[in-house]
Regions:
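Long, low-complexity regulatory segments enriched in Ser/Thr/Pro/Gly and acidic residues
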Residues: 1-138
């Protein structure tokens, strides 16, 4: 399982996302021969969290980063959230590859505030995500 590489576009597109606020979210996948993580989709700043969830496939694993904006008693907050999406319908080998490569991609994506691992849409409830981020970010 070792040896999965990150396509150069992964860090380039992520840096545009983080530094230039060019996108609302990015979804990453493995290439066809499962040897490299590649950018699958970037979403315009007008995209919503619902769009992000809808772009995650039902039977294939993905990584994602989402620019989360939310309110606290202290005011508005913005955090970059990393998602590991391994739905119940995806193959065991794919789940293992994505889990094994998670540390590699997280290391390349500097500035992540929180990590969410989900296997079904119920685990992607926005209110629950915000609550988790608030507890992590104190």
């Amino acid at each position: 399982m070792a040896g999965i590489q990150l396509n150069d576009d992964v860090t380039t597109v992520y840096n545009d996302f983080k530094l230039s606020h060019k996108y609302k979210y990015i979804i990453f996948k493995m290439n066809d021969d499962m040897s490299e993580v590649v950018v699958e989709k970037t979403a315009e700043k007008t995209a919503t969290y619902e769009d992000f969830v809808n772009d995650l496939p039902e039977k294939s694993a993905r990584y994602g980063v989402f620019d989360l904006h939310y309110e606290t008693e202290e005011g508005a907050r913005e955090k970059i959230i990393f998602f590991l999406w391994t739905p119940n319908g995806c193959k065991i080998k794919e789940k293992m590859l994505f889990s094994a490569t998670k540390a590699t991609i997280k290391q390349a994506l500097v500035g992540l505030s929180a990590e969410i691992q989900a296997t079904d849409a119920g685990e992607l409830n926005l209110d629950d995500i915000i609550a988790k981020v608030k507890t992590i970010s104190k």
